[in-house]
From Swiss-Prot:
Entry keywords, A to Z: Ribonucleoprotein, Ribosomal protein
Protein name: Large ribosomal subunit protein bL17
Native source organism of the sequence: Staphylococcus haemolyticus (strain JCSC1435)
Intrachain S-S bonds: none
GO CC annotations, alphabetized: cytosolic large ribosomal subunit
GO biological process, one term: translation
The family this protein is said to belong to: Belongs to the bacterial ribosomal protein bL17 family.
Recorded GO MF terms: structural constituent of ribosome
Assembly and interaction partners: Part of the 50S ribosomal subunit. Contacts protein L32.
Matches recorded under InterPro entries: Ribosomal_bL17 (IPR000456), Ribosomal_bL17_CS (IPR047859), Ribosomal_bL17_sf (IPR036373)
Length: 123
């Protein structure tokens, strides 16, 4: 299976996909271009599958990709993106066998006309 270069070098592309994947795990919904959304979808699907496995090796593999971002919950406690992935998100998708994300087209971006989409986690 091929991949999109997204007009960047390999290290820039990897960093951008890590950032987008972490943002999607934290926010559960982000707006980006269609090409980026299609690329980050495969990264996030694999991360959620690792989260469902839940063993130590899966946690370490997911930690390689996700940024170490702290999330403030409503009850004033903090958790990292990795904890949210292996706790809340993995529990939500125990019965689902893939297809954890949805891409909704928004229309062209005003500045350059790039096709904007919203990528979100399916409930």
């Amino acid at each position: 299976m091929g991949y999109r270069k997204l007009g960047r070098t390999s290290d820039q592309r990897k960093a951008m996909l890590r950032d987008l994947a972490t943002s999607l795990i934290v926010s559960e919904r982000i707006e980006t271009t269609e090409a980026r959304a299609k690329e980050v979808r495969s990264v996030v699907e694999k991360l959620i599958t690792l989260g469902k496995k839940g063993d130590l090796a899966s946690r370490r593999n997911a930690a390689k990709t996700l940024r170490n971002v702290e999330i403030l919950n409503e009850d004033e406690t903090t958790q990292t993106a990795l904890q949210k992935l292996f706790g809340e998100i993995a529990e939500r998708y125990t019965e689902r066998q893939g297809g954890y994300t949805r891409i909704l087209k928004v229309g062209p971006r005003r500045g350059d006309g790039a096709e904007s989409v919203i990528i979100e986690l399916v409930d």
